[in-house]
């Protein structure tokens, strides 16, 4: 349940849907497995996984939701070879070339015949709805997957006025300034990884890992006009992260010491532990968002 990535969105209008109403709305779009002829299925599933019993898990007016996607795995090469074999057979028997429309129909037939025997894979994407911040945090490193979840949520609710999080000034300008100064604003602390890009197309990209970012070798690249587009940070003693210039957060990791804060809850009651972990994670992510918005100079004003 602990989030590992953050793709960030904000509401244009306050989110005022109560837990019960949200649960009811999502119930109409519950996930169901693929049938023999389905290529893929996508829907909402229990927020807390197999041990959960509801599509929405809420605490302190913070709502956790989860979408599950199942996809049949049909290798393109298998379809291509089967189609070529079928086309060659028909063309040989009928002594003519098949038209594109006929080939497309044959391809559909082949896919239909392969679907019942195809393996499938499932993936889950979770999101945290934070009305207090007017934000949605999607646990995904892929903007495409995040948008898929939001599209499904929009379909369930009828409308979802959200936009990607954006700041008053480009994120890379702040990251570059932090690197120049040798430190990030508290409670953030720079670590030993960064990616610098030149604004010119031919300027290239430089990546540093496990290196002191205060060294002259690193700073020399700033002097040539490169800007910082990725920067590894610690948020206090609780979270390690990689902040990117598109305002997304990758490789989010809660420290063992922080997660141990719920050890007193124990593991005898799995649901109680999951509930406690969710409350702990939610509170810290809210604190992280407050600190991030402040460190990056505030959010860009939205237009209704």
Swiss-Prot record:
Subcellular location per the Swiss-Prot or TrEMBL entry: Cytoplasm, Nucleoid
Any one cellular-component term (Gene Ontology): cytoplasm
Major localization listed first in the record, in broad terms: cytoplasm
Record keyword Oxidoreductase present: no
Gene Ontology MF terms in the entry: double-stranded DNA binding
InterPro entries named in the record: RdgC
Pfam families from the UniProt entry: RdgC (PF04381)
Domain of life: Bacteria
One Gene Ontology biological process: DNA recombination
Cystine bridges: none
Alphabetically ordered keywords of this record: Cytoplasm, DNA recombination
Similarity section: Belongs to the RdgC family.
HAMAP family: RdgC
Function statement: May be involved in recombination.
The protein's name in its UniProt record: Recombination-associated protein RdgC
Organism: Shewanella sp. (strain W3-18-1)
Lineage, uppermost ranks: Bacteria, Pseudomonadati, Pseudomonadota, Gammaproteobacteria, Alteromonadales
């Amino acid at each position: 349940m602990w989030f590992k990535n953050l793709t960030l969105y904000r509401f244009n209008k306050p989110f005022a849907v109560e837990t019960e109403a949200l649960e009811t709305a999502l119930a109409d779009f519950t996930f169901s497995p693929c049938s023999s002829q389905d290529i893929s299925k996508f829907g909402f599933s229990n927020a807390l996984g197999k041990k959960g019993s509801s599509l929405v898990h809420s605490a302190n007016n913070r709502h956790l939701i989860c979408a599950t996607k199942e996809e049949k795995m049909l290798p393109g090469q298998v379809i291509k070879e089967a189609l070529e074999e079928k086309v060659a057979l028909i063309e040989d028997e009928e002594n003519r070339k098949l038209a594109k429309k006929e080939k497309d129909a044959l391809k559909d037939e082949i896919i239909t015949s392969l679907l019942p025997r195809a393996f499938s894979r499932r993936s889950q994407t979770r999101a945290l709805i934070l009305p207090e911040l007017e934000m949605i945090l999607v646990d995904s490193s892929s903007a495409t997957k995040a948008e898929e979840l939001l599209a499904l949520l929009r379909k369930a609710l009828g409308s979802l006025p959200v936009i990607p999080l954006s700041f008053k000034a480009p994120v890379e300008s702040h990251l570059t300034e932090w690197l120049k100064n040798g430190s990030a604003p508290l409670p953030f602390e720079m670590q030993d990884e960064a990616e610098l890009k030149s604004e010119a197309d031919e300027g290239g990209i430089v990546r540093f890992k496990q290196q002191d970012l205060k060294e002259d070798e690193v700073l020399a690249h700033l002097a040539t006009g490169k800007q910082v587009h990725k920067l590894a940070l610690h948020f206090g003693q609780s979270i390690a992260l990689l902040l990117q210039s598109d305002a997304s957060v990758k490789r989010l990791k809660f420290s063992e010491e922080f997660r141990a804060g719920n050890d007193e809850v124990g593991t005898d009651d799995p649901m109680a532990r999951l509930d406690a972990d969710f409350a702990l994670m939610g509170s810290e992510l809210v604190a992280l968002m407050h600190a991030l918005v402040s460190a990056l100079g505030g959010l860009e004003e939205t237009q209704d």
